[in-house]
A protein has these predicted regions:
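Nucleic-acid substrate recognition interfaces
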Residues: 1-225
Length: 225
């Protein structure tokens, strides 16, 4: 079977525009959520997820063959295409979840509080390889990220915590990592990498196995049994 492990590498404090990048990405998700909330009737009748995504992108992005209905390109000029698509996917998920909760609320007789479509979000950008993320020189604790400096999208060299990089070199050298996701914890920024690997399951009978189950609570800590 396949298992996925992840590890967050801390970005050392430096003068790079991470906050501006995070702000513009979340603003884009907020704007798109409002747009797709208004256009959900026409989007919801498209059953295929890929076709629905393409239709959603056509609503906000102008190309040679398509004229966008909404002014996303004017509000967020030069946003990298992969980041724009990530924001679109996140916004579609938020609107779809809201519409599902609304249907359930109406089906149950509108007894509980009415669901709200919340535009504020805590979305974190994914730095896709080559177009948003590049590895640094081999053996050096660095990487290159495409960030928004308040005027344009530019490449910045970011310094990574040495102990975190040593851990990755020791345990994950040669393994392919997914595109890293930006993460913010305790006023610090991290790049979280995920690694997929094949694991052979034990052939011990179920009766003789020790099984650990984890219940991840929404408002409580995890419960392990």
């Amino acid at each position: 079977m396949q298992t996925v492990s992840s590890y967050g590498v801390e970005l050392r404090k430096q003068n790079i525009p991470l906050r501006q990048t995070l702000e513009i990405y979340r603003s884009a998700v907020c704007y798109l959520t409002e747009v797709y909330g208004k256009a959900w009737k026409e989007l919801s009748v498209i059953p295929d997820a890929k076709r629905r995504f393409n239709a959603a992108e056509h609503l906000v992005h102008t190309t040679k063959k398509n004229s966008a209905r909404f002014d996303f390109d004017l509000r967020f000029p030069k946003m990298p295409s992969y980041l724009r698509r990530s924001a679109i996917q996140h916004a579609l998920g938020m609107v779809s979840s809201y519409e599902t909760r609304m249907e359930l609320w109406e089906k149950e007789g509108k007894r509980a509080g009415k669901p709200r479509l919340v535009y504020e979000n805590h979305a974190m950008p994914v730095f896709y390889r080559d177009v948003m993320y590049r590895e640094g020189t081999e053996g050096r604790d660095e990487a290159y990220l495409k960030l928004y400096d308040g005027h344009d999208w530019k490449w910045f060299c970011v310094r990574l915590l040495h102990t975190d990089m040593e851990y990755l070199r020791k345990h994950w050298l040669g393994k392919k990592a997914s595109a890293p996701t930006l993460e913010r914890r305790h006023h610090k920024y991290f790049l979280r990498f995920s690694y997929t690997e094949e694991v052979i399951l034990t052939k011990t009978s179920v009766k003789d196995q020790v099984i650990c189950s984890v219940d991840l609570g929404i408002n409580t800590d995890a419960v392990c049994t």
